[in-house]
Amino acid sequence: VPAAAGIPLTHRGLARGFSVVSAHEDLIATVPVRRDHTLVLLMGVHHLRRSTAILTDRGADSETPAAVVERGYQPDQRVTTTRLRCLPDVAESVGVRAPAVIVLGDVVTVSPAWRHRLVPGE
């Protein structure tokens, strides 16, 4: 699904690896939180605030690029991009709904949707 939004999971100079996990606290608590690692969260729309808190508490950079890909590969696909620190509020303000995949990492900046990111104050 990230590919539907033009987001590669790895990219030279941006990400050397990736993890794909469901957005359960015990799984989020074990994934790498490095700038050179892409994180894909499944079934995470209803847990965005908690997931964001866990990741930042573990040392994830709050400025990490983030994308939510709703209804990937469907005619009504929507991609919302922002920064990790803004993700829960932006998702709420635009009405993000499942099914959706959340992508966290510098690879999000490769997506054409990054030009239209929603970051208050930026």
Predicted regions and their residues:
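A contiguous loop/helix-start segment that scaffolds small-molecule binding in enzyme catalytic cores
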Residues: 15-17, 22-122
